[in-house]
Amino acid sequence: MYDLLKTIDDPADLRRLDRRQLQPLADELRAFVLDSVSKTGGHLSSNLGTVELTIALHYVFNTPNDRIVWDVGHQTYPHKILTGRRDQMHSLRQYDGISGFPRRSESEYDTFGTAHSSTSISAALGMAIGSQLNGDDRFSIAVIGDGAMTAGMAFEAMNNAGVSEDAKLLVILNDNDMSISPPVGALNRHLARLMSGRFYAAARAGVERVLSVAPPVLELARKLEEHAKGMVVPATLFEEFGFNYIGPIDGHDLDSLIPTLQNIRELRGPQFLHVVTKKGQGYKLAEADPVLYHGPGKFNPAEGIKPSTTPAKKTYTQVFGEWLCDEAERDTRVVGITPAMREGSGMVEFEKRFKDRYYDVGIAEQHAVTFAGGLATEGLKPVVAIYSTFLQRAYDQLIHDVALQNLPVVFAIDRAGLVGADGATHAGAYDLAFMRCIPNMTIMAASDENECRQMLHTALQQPNPTAVRYPRGAGTGVATVKEFTEIPLGKGEVRRRTSQPEGKRVAILAFGTMVAPSLAAAEELDATVANMRFVKPVDAALVRELAETHDYVVTVEEGCVMGGAGSACVEALMESGVIRPVLQLGLPDLFIDHGDPAKLLSQCGLDGAGIAKSIRERFLNPAADVAGQAKRVA
């Protein structure tokens, strides 16, 4: 099994194969990807669709001297397998294992780290120009999906690249969402080879030089050329950016891919190759339902993904989806917006029931936020469902287009905190810090499912921009209450009171997901716990009351410490004039790797045991007190 694949330890081994061996290799590689992902979980459909393209790129180009940048990066499992990581695939997305995305520190073949979309063309262009300036002769290749091409950044890069006439740059559009079959067969294959050949490029340049003295004739020639292409391929705007457009070609046909790429390798200037692939290629269940098999957990490939037979706790994403439908049913002004995350954000049912008020704007976070602001000016109630990590991409719009004008937009921020297997690129670590400094913002953090529902309802009633953050995955098991209750603005609640004597009283001010582990720590230490609820405006009165009645104050949040919720509490204490020792707990000042979320939180000291340990070591350890006193005396 995998007889050919076992011989490939790097692309140099691949390039030694005979062309006739490549399709059998592709079959083995596809089977290996399916087997690996079924055991570890991960992205499947997209990787099954890029097998032949990956083989062709490494076969034709001299990687790693030639650079390949994979947009988004979740389709790079075949690339990882062919570049020396075949025997590490069992650790994919596991703690201390290899990443599910390209990572420069992991391999020299991962030339640029990706995970967010639409960055590849900019990076590849920078590499191409950098190589020129350094006097290096190498190709830079960006592989980008049709979804990622909807983002403005991709077109900004195209616009810049088109004027770089000598750059050895290739942009490959991996089009896996075409509604019609790609043109295939001898004629299309011949056209792709012709359009990528040196004769075509040279002839075209020569004709343009000759006809430049007669602009009307040149324009006619251009129109005739475009019309000739249009008879066989889709009309293209890419040549308007200065690219030579080639395709579309079948991205699963190595006999088409390889000669086309070989021709392109001999050209200079920006080239654009349009390949058509199929998500889930070669695995019928994934072909039939690529969304279901986009990012599955472990499963049996022979049986496919089976519905769980054990009752599961409701996820926060489900809580949001149900809330949005309930609010839309009550109020026709409610509008739902998502930047290409319908399933991930829990908006499938909303789209079905309220299609005229559902807007999937594509991978366009900046547009989504400003679009919501425009809706708000017309008296509508826009709700932007967005992952914490992707809201970062629309920071200027959040400030300039929404908060500055104090527009009532609700931000439902999913995947707040650590996200597990996707790792640092997708962690929602920064939203509290980057939103808290924005005037007019109200920010809430949910501690359980029902509180999340009521916070979302509260947010919808506010006359200003309001954010509710909640984590990925299942909640605590708390039932949601159908009736809505508006939470008093800026008010937290005490969930547990200490019975400790003076001198040992600890108050834990917990935010969102950290309420439950803080309560666990408090049981061990006999501490007071407050569910702060609001990060902005923080409950300054509650902060002062607890500081005045306790000896030590601890803040706990699942976000970066610097500038976060704990900082809000410290600022409130300073404003009140109450001086108390404060311990701020949260995510450390580093990018936290992928792994099991519970294990990662434990590693960060943010489970019950870790919180108790930190408090004990800082405030309640007699040995530490004695050492501290001795140090002060000295």
Curated annotation (Swiss-Prot):
It catalyses: D-glyceraldehyde 3-phosphate + pyruvate + H(+) = 1-deoxy-D-xylulose 5-phosphate + CO2. Its EC number is 2.2.1.7. Thiamine diphosphate binds at H74, A115, H116, S117, G147, A148, N176, Y283, E365. PROSITE patterns: TRANSKETOLASE_1 (PS00801), TRANSKETOLASE_2 (PS00802). The keyword Transcription does not apply. Gene3D superfamilies: 3.40.50.920, 3.40.50.970. It comes from the Bacteria. GO terms for molecular function: 1-deoxy-D-xylulose-5-phosphate synthase activity; magnesium ion binding; thiamine pyrophosphate binding. Its cofactor is Mg(2+); thiamine diphosphate. One of its GO terms (cellular component) is cytosol. One of its GO terms (biological process) is isopentenyl diphosphate biosynthetic process, methylerythritol 4-phosphate pathway. Mg(2+) binds at D146, N176. Keywords: Isoprene biosynthesis, Magnesium, Metal-binding, Thiamine biosynthesis, Thiamine pyrophosphate, Transferase. The keyword Nucleotide-binding does not apply. Binds 1 Mg(2+) ion per subunit. Binds 1 thiamine pyrophosphate per subunit. Pathway: Metabolic intermediate biosynthesis; 1-deoxy-D-xylulose 5-phosphate biosynthesis; 1-deoxy-D-xylulose 5-phosphate from D-glyceraldehyde 3-phosphate and pyruvate: step 1/1. Homodimer. PANTHER family: 1-D-DEOXYXYLULOSE 5-PHOSPHATE SYNTHASE-RELATED, 1-DEOXY-D-XYLULOSE-5-PHOSPHATE SYNTHASE, CHLOROPLASTIC. This is 1-deoxy-D-xylulose-5-phosphate synthase. It comes from Burkholderia cenocepacia (strain ATCC BAA-245 / DSM 16553 / LMG 16656 / NCTC 13227 / J2315 / CF5610). The gene is dxs.
